Amino acid sequence: MTDAPRKRRRSWRRFALLLLLLTGAAGAFAIANRGYILPFLPEQDVIRFERWQRVTYASLGWTWPGTPDLNALDQRLAAAGVKVGAPVLVRIFKREFELEIWLKKGDRFERFATYPICKWSGRLGPKVRQGDRQAPEGFYTVGGKALNPNSRWYRSFNLGFPNAHDRALRRSGSFIMVHGGCSSIGCYAMTNAQMSEIWKLVKGALDGGQQRFQTQVFPFRLTDANLASRAGTADGDFWQSLKPGHDLFEQTGVPPRVSVCNKRYAFEAGNPGADGSAELETRCSARTAKVN
């Protein structure tokens, strides 16, 4: 009688190990052949496929290809000519599963690192209401009070959703984070290892005197081709509205001044040397570029 439970436990362990190995093999095969598989799938299926691969990697303790060398932060900072404490700016690209950290060097920001996002939830498009499990898109500012060193998901910072633009459109939700781990119901999960480095950089910037850092969240790389291929979709106009702010930063390396006018994002070029600390304002100006 006492041997039966032991045999069942051993059987379940063998089954679990086999399942883990098969999952790992399938994940390795899928990733190795992703260039052949992905072009034939609808975009939302491609996104689900990407999530599955990344969650599989994380569950097996593997490092996703393209992850920065997290053991060489000091050397990477030295090579870039910057230090912990430099003002920071964050950009997120959902479709590419990438989070970028930009650090201020002189009067401009320069891209320091690109981190693969482990998981975000929902589809491409903005968060609209509480419980829709959407990860937001738009322009946000993050201050010291938004940082949580004791997060359920290791460490986190609150994006500040809903911002003035979201509130103008009566979008609802709360506690939308960038955090560790690899689970999401509306947040951006980065794994604990990556979040440790991201945390060090953003906290260092805030401790060093930056009041807030700008976080720009885009559905995908806002190239003309990417926008044209999605023109006429439900979110096409909203995505087009993000491009002026995206392009101002690309062109100048200075965070744009962001405001909301008539429920629409509006952008002005940031002053030379600005660090992106300015909060989102609700105001209209003759100088602002107004697009939805």
Protein language model features and the residues they cover:
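N-terminal pre-domains immediately preceding structured catalytic cores
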Residues: 2-185, 193-292
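A conserved hydrophobic position in a structured secondary element of the catalytic/binding core
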Residues: 190
